[in-house]
């Protein structure tokens, strides 16, 4: 999530050649140091978004914005994640803008997430826009370790190239929220009971998302939405910060 794939591959090759984990250890420490210590940080949601996009959707991250930080306490404006894929039918290159929102209230989380993703996936790349800056970052700091792929991607991302018209914008959303269904005592509820409880609520959650999508006028655009119910979003943030601090 935090380190460009090319650097990771180089460190792994160094270990194979020398038997030393020095470079991998240095990258690990560098990655840990890039996370902010701010209590209201959204980086926990962004990390989960990255994991879901790569693991479940098989969409590789195309740019490591964390690695561009000059100060760990700062945040980059623009999308929370930028991933890449190819449509199986049209063979178009698809750029997936990612947004994550963690709020205690589900309605607010959905509202904020759709409000943020809308201008990204409908953008005409107006001058000075956050998404235009992300496109510039893609051109300069592309997270690939394949020269041919890098060259092809640059053509897809260049408005002056004929291939630019084959680029399609899509979205990935992660919506985290509080829910009271989790047990507060040992052995009070098993995993099957919890799954059943969530399943009973899914239709209502889905309808809320559809309503917001229509209101944002992004209906018809390909959009993956992950809903993550937490016992407490605030507790998750604190636990993540504590873990990253080695506590």
Question: Language-model segments: what does each one mean?
Answer:
Residues 47-56:
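Amphipathic alpha-helical segments that form well-ordered structural scaffolds
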Residues 87-93:
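Short, solvent-exposed loop/turn segments that connect beta-strands within catalytic domains
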Residues 74-78:
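A short, glycine/Asx- and small/polar-enriched loop/turn
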Residues 53, 80-83, 95-102:
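Conserved catalytic cores of phosphodiester-cleaving nucleases, focusing on short active-site segments
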Residues 111-192, 196:
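Acidic, metal/cofactor-coordinating or nucleic-acid-engaging core segments within structured domains
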Residues 1-40:
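Interdomain/boundary linker segments immediately adjacent to catalytic/signaling cores
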Residues 57-73:
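A short acidic/basic microdomain associated with nuclease active sites
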Residues 186-247:
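Extended, charged low-complexity segments
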